[in-house]
Structures are given as C-alpha cells and as structure tokens.
C-alpha cells in the first residue's frame, strides 16, 4: 500500500517515518525545497534508509494538485501536514478525485469547508483534525465515553493536553515553558475565544480563563485553562448525545497561566513582542514531553486515562504525539477499514459515514498501532 504525505517538515517527516514503519510505501511532496532536501537528514534510521521512499519538490504551490493527480491511481491514502492556507484546496482536490484524505487540521473554518464538500460528493472516507489536539485527545475521550455508555446519562467529558519541557528543564525560565511548535499558533490559541459545553448549553469563553489545578498521576501538580482549537467538533457531538459538560484545556506547569495572562491582558503586549518572549526568552525545547488526559463521568463512575510521551533521539515528544495518531488512523483508512463499513457502535449497528468522526475510530486497534510505533518509548 502507498501513502502520499503532503508537507515534509517536522510533522511530515514523523508521519513519513510512521507510515513506513506501518508497512507503507511512502511518497513525500513539499513546496519547500529546503524542507524536502533536509528530510532524509532529520531521521536517523538504523538501516540508513530515509523515512519516505520517494521525494518530490513542487516549486509552485499551484502544482500540488497536479502532483496529487499524477499519483492518484497508486495512492491508498493522502495525509496532509501542509500549512492552513494550502490545506483547503488540496483537500477539495482529493475529495473530487475519490481519494481517502486526512489532515492535522486545527482551523475550524477550513475543516468545515472540507467536511461540507465531503458530505456532498465524497466517495471515499475523509477525516480532518487528526493531530494531537484536535485529534488524539478527542479519540481518547470517545474511548472513555464508549466505555461508560449505557444506562444513565454521561454528564461530564473533559479533555486536556500539555506540551511541556522535560521536568528536569522546567525551571530554566520564569514561564516554565519551551517552544515545541509554532509560537504564532500558540499565541492564537491563548488569545482566541473558545467554545465549551456547560450545563447542556454551548457557550463562548475567553482563552486562558477557567484556570484550575490538576493533579496528574504522571507529572504531579499542573494547571489547566481554556485554549481554542483543541475541542474540534467534540463539543457539538457531546451536546447532541445529551452530555451536560464538555471542555478542552491546555496543561502547563504551575504559574505559567497567570504570568502569560498578565503579559497579554494587563500589559497588552502585541503579538510580535509575545512571540519574542516565547522564542528568545523560553527558547526551543531540547527535551520535551506531552501529557494527554481524558476524563469521563456519570453518576458515581469515572473513567480517566493519562498518556505521557517523551522525546527521544529521533523525534520530539510533540512530533510523536501529533504525527503518530494521524498515521495510525491513516493506515486504517488505507486498508479500507472505514469503506462502506457497518459496525456495532454504542449499542447498535451503524454504517460509518464518509466524513469520519472520533467516535468511529476502533480504540483497541488504534492503541495497538500507537504502541507498534513506539510512541511511549
């Protein structure tokens, strides 16, 4: 089977590695010549191989769709880790040409556009928002929901994710933070409004509000607050199923939230200054870790799961926690698992739609493949 990976930067490289390890022939395409040329150097495989079997550099972004069309007869799944501004057109092209498609997502308007078209004309499964948050944490929350489903109504679904410096390095700056992904994206998530489900009603809250203390089984005392993007369609999905409360929060070491909130709101620093604080003041992570927590409650029953991913000699924790989940789902898509399939889901038979949701992911197989990729090593 063949996987076409669009965008071979940090995340695309990790996706290519994962798909190769899952037994796929991997074709990598990028519009950035430097990224494509550096890709083989980013992953030190034991046998000297590169993480993708073929590389193509497209100098003109408008030629991306031509490249996809050229490979469409041999490709079993297309995985996009392209920037937001390139994703929509590429996804529409894949849908119109009957290709299985998935992406890291994160932009609500772009994902809505892709899914709306897929509902109208898709002939193969389409799955957006499949990174870490949104992505893995939402799948984990669905696992909890389905574990407790039946009898009385589920009341609360809480999702939390933290990309953190390794604890041994967590006191190197006052914010107790390091950059493991886009600082611009981080600032947007802190500043943008968020949607939550509260007492059965969808509400809008400010990013960085809702500060609470969290006792992690793996990392001890942390804090959490609302940030945008990570919930994806889980809020609306849980409301439709009668859940009272559902939210997504970001996890940080204690003290981070109050300090950043002071800089953003009280000092009213502009984005350029905030970017400089994060990049130059905190710096990029030498060693990082990602913690993923999902908690589901009903009556006196609680389902809670924590996952901890650490960086290794090959990838950062953020790369593994973002790229390995989408690769796992993409491998199932490529194998035809979601094609015209009826499964027993939440107590009854259900034909899987072509626009897939987190509830459609088979949790046992998903978790098994994550372990095959060595996500916890």
Give the ranges of each region predicted by the language model.
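Rossmann-fold cofactor-recognition segment
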Residues: 45-62
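Conserved N-terminal Rossmann-fold NAD(P)-binding element of oxidoreductases
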Residues: 3-7
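ADP-ribose/adenylate-binding Rossmann-like module
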Residues: 83, 93-111
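C-terminal catalytic/substrate-binding lobe primarily of soluble NAD(P)-dependent oxidoreductases
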Residues: 147-377
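Conserved Rossmann-fold cofactor-binding substructure of NAD(P)-dependent oxidoreductases
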Residues: 59-72
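Hydrophobic/small residue at the entry helix of a nucleotide-binding pocket
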Residues: 11
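Helix N-cap at the beta1-alpha1 junction of Rossmann-like dinucleotide-binding domains, i.e.
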Residues: 32-35, 108
């Amino acid at each position: 089977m063949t996987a076409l990976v669009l965008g071979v930067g940090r995340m695309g490289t990790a996706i290519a590695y994962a798909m190769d390890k899952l037994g796929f022939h991997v074709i990598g395409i990028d519009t950035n010549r430097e990224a494509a040329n550096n890709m083989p150097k980013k992953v030190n495989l034991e046998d000297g191989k590169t993480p993708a079997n073929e590389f193509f550099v497209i100098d003109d972004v408008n030629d991306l769709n031509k490249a996809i069309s050229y490979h469409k007869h041999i490709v079993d799944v297309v995985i996009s880790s392209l920037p937001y501004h390139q994703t929509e057109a590429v996804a529409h092209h894949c849908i119109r040409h009957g290709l299985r498609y998935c992406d890291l997502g994160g932009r609500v308007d772009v994902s809505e556009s892709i899914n709306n078209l897929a509902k109208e004309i898709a002939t193969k499964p389409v799955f957006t928002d499949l990174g870490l948050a949104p992505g893995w944490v939402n799948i984990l929350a669905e696992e909890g929901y389905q574990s407790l489903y039946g009898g009385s109504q589920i009341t609360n679904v809480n999702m939390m994710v933290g990309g953190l410096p390794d604890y041994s390095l967590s006191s190197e700056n006052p914010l107790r933070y390091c950059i493991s992904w886009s600082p611009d994206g981080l600032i947007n998530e802190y500043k943008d409004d968020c949607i939550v489900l509260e007492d059965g009603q969808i509400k809008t809250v400010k990013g960085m509000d809702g500060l609470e203390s969290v006792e992690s089984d793996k990392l001890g005392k942390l804090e959490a607050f609302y940030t945008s993007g990570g919930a994806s369609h889980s809020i609306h999905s849980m409301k439709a199923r009668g859940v009272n409360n559902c939210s997504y929060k970001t996890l940080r070491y204690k003290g981070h939230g109050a300090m950043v909130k002071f800089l953003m709101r009280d000092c009213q620093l502009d984005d350029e200054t905030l970017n400089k604080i994060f990049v130059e003041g905190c710096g990029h992570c030498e060693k990082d870790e990602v913690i993923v927590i999902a908690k589901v409650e009903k009556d006196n029953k609680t389902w809670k799961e924590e996952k901890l991913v650490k960086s290794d000699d090959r990838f950062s924790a953020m790369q593994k926690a973002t790229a390995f989940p989408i690769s796992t789902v993409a491998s199932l898509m490529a194998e035809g698992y979601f094609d015209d399939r009826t499964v027993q889901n939440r107590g009854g038979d259900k034909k899987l739609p072509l626009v897939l949701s987190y509830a459609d992911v088979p949790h046992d197989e998903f978790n098994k493949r994550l372990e095959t990729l060595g996500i916890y090593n």
